[in-house]
UniProtKB/Swiss-Prot annotation:
The lineage of its organism: Archaea, Methanobacteriati, Methanobacteriota, Thermococci, Thermococcales. This is Aspartate carbamoyltransferase catalytic subunit. GO terms for molecular function: amino acid binding; aspartate carbamoyltransferase activity. The gene is pyrB. The keyword Transferase applies. L-aspartate binds at residues 86, 168, 229. Keywords: Pyrimidine biosynthesis, Transferase. SUPFAM superfamilies: Aspartate/ornithine carbamoyltransferase. It holds the Pfam family OTCace. Belongs to the aspartate/ornithine carbamoyltransferase superfamily. ATCase family. It comes from Pyrococcus horikoshii (strain ATCC 700860 / DSM 12428 / JCM 9974 / NBRC 100139 / OT-3).
Amino acid sequence: MEWKGRDVISIRDFSKEDIEVVLSTAERLEKEMKEKGQLEYAKGKILATLFFEPSTRTRLSFESAMHRLGGSVIGFAEASTSSVKKGESLRDTIKTVEQYSDVIVIRHPKEGAARLAAEVADIPVINAGDGSNQHPTQTLLDLYTIKKEFGTIDGLKIGLLGDLKYGRTVHSLAEALAFYDVELYLISPELLRMPKHIVEELRERGMKIVETTKLEEVIGELDVLYVTRIQKERFPDEQEYLKVKGSYQVNLKILENVKDSLRIMHPLPRVDEIHPEVDKTKHAIYFKQVFNGVPVRMALLALVLGVI
């Protein structure tokens, strides 16, 4: 598929070949970045970052990626600093911003907002998270992290832990992992199980899936444990949140009987689901994961801008 001008809205829009193109381009750009520091692929290009929802890693990672490519960045980190506060529609905001930029990255609390932005804009739009729906760039950096650690994605046993109902990162990741020969363990409280339609679709694609509420019973099997926080802001009422708050914590005790090769990932931010004492163990790679966001987003920006 032609990359120049392409939107990145959902991992469902990607084939396995598309994913591999992004991963191999990220690997190449990471090497070049480490050798040269500043690259010039995107010289003269402008990225607009439109964040209608809070973000630390995704926004800064995209900005860092664009600067590393030699481009520049405009945008806002919260809707209150834009004309949205005055009642401007998303459609008009997008049409305005595209006059100033070559590519748009958007995060929005409403599912489908990124797709709408892509339909309106004549320049590439990249989804940085739309509600509890999709977070495709996080998924790509997660896959890149796993491949860097293990040399492959095939043959691994991967556990997704925590908020599998509202967590957009795990929805996207599970769908992408269906392209690979992996066993997927879905570990969550009953109230926060992976949506049934996603599980059914994954099984139809031939994926082997184990669903459980008990982390301690399966953690010894895993090669990768992908931990997520309970997403308080997505719950319809606080009582439902309080029922599941603090359901799991990964600490040194629970790691006593795991594989030596187990790697623990987290899209961050974390609350209390991974104890800080785990950070110094060889199992923890969530800060490496943060770094990996830069070359992966460099790859996506370079590809959709048609500069690589």
